[in-house]
């Protein structure tokens, strides 16, 4: 009996000790959790230090842990930046931008929150169907639009673009320029990894044309297909895409996703010249169509941004279509280079020497705050969000000091694309002529839409699509 009592006593002691240990542990965990959620107050908003919340593959694990502490309750402490276009897909995330913290979300229920300070729009998805109106004095509008006007023409007119306070576009004049969005680094331009010697290219010329064209977005506003069609009358061109198609790619390379495939690069690198024609003619709108041939060691024959000379690695690294009065003259020049190795290689000298002499390009790449396919850097959407966040906080601090807010506004040169023009020789092709009439008509129509949008937004109340179109066609 005594032994049984002793056993019960020992069991009771052990249970009590275990309970006491668990109680203390729970209290410690609770205190740690409370300390994680504390942040110093600045007026009604908080700007204390916060672990970076970056969307990079190398930091996913850290972000998962971080998100446990910074979720929707932050809307009571940090300014809200609401993506009106659901570009990021994030329902709620607190992001660190230097010393500032903002809450980013696509949840439109925050539209009327007193903490909402900015609305972010993606240009391609920008629609008049639903806008965050009425717009309060402290509501900034920010536009992210890296695409050509083909995606949303109305934004490229002064009445529409100047509705925004902050911009990230392909223009060098934008608040966050995305001009080099398709250029990974200066190093890829210098690299000789894909380059094929001219002697081998001469040998390959027995079965290849001197020029290659790869486009599947046909009948673009730039009228590029009309030019290439006329060029084909004067020189041989291998066309692998759906536009003016005359040569097949291997089956596994016919999908658009294969455009960055190493085997696709090998095919293009065999050519001496690549037709690098943009789908629209806009200042600073430069895509992979230029950077790809420069990377591969092929001479680009470029048609696009009128200011392209400002972005080329050297003064003699590309042939500019604008320098020739007719495709016939361009064909004659390319034939001359094709038959003269020394003159041809003059366009590749910069690459062979690794000598990029354009200070504007070097400076732009050095000062760029975002990376392309680089997990060690923020992407341009992160950088855009933080630019707006920092500016929002700048005005919060100015308000606390009793100062007037800083006013930012977009300018017409933040998206500068002139009216589309057809090549004069394209009139011989009826379908192409009617196509250009469509793009020109679209441009003229978009001017009316931009004006109508401005009128309705300045009323500062919601409007219907019927009201919008009545105003458009009233002009």
Curated annotation (Swiss-Prot):
It is an enzyme of class 2 (transferase). Glycans are attached at residues 107, 165, 315, 462. Residues 30-475 are lumenal. It is a single-pass type II membrane protein. It catalyses: L-threonyl-[protein] + GDP-beta-L-fucose = 3-O-(alpha-L-fucosyl)-L-threonyl-[protein] + GDP + H(+); L-seryl-[protein] + GDP-beta-L-fucose = 3-O-(alpha-L-fucosyl)-L-seryl-[protein] + GDP + H(+). Its EC number is 2.4.1.221. Pathway: Protein modification; protein glycosylation. Its main location: endoplasmic reticulum. SUPFAM superfamilies: UDP-Glycosyltransferase/glycogen phosphorylase (SSF53756). Gene3D superfamilies: Glycosyl transferase family 10, C-terminal domain. GO terms for molecular function: alpha-(1->3)-fucosyltransferase activity; peptide-O-fucosyltransferase activity. InterPro entries: Alpha-1_3-FUT_met (IPR017176), Glyco_tran_10_C (IPR055270), Glyco_tran_10_N (IPR031481), Glyco_trans_10 (IPR001503), GT10-like_C_sf (IPR038577). GO terms for cellular component: endoplasmic reticulum; endoplasmic reticulum membrane; Golgi membrane. Residues 1-8 are cytoplasmic. Disulfide bonds join 386-389. One of its GO terms (biological process) is positive regulation of protein secretion. It is found in: Endoplasmic reticulum membrane. Keywords: Disulfide bond, Endoplasmic reticulum, Glycoprotein, Glycosyltransferase, Membrane, Signal-anchor, Transferase, Transmembrane, Transmembrane helix. Protein O-fucosyltransferase that specifically catalyzes O-fucosylation of serine or threonine residues in EMI domains of target proteins. Attaches fucose through an O-glycosidic linkage. O-fucosylation of EMI domain-containing proteins may be required for facilitating protein folding and secretion. Belongs to the glycosyltransferase 10 family. This is GDP-fucose protein O-fucosyltransferase 3. It comes from Gallus gallus. The gene is FUT10.
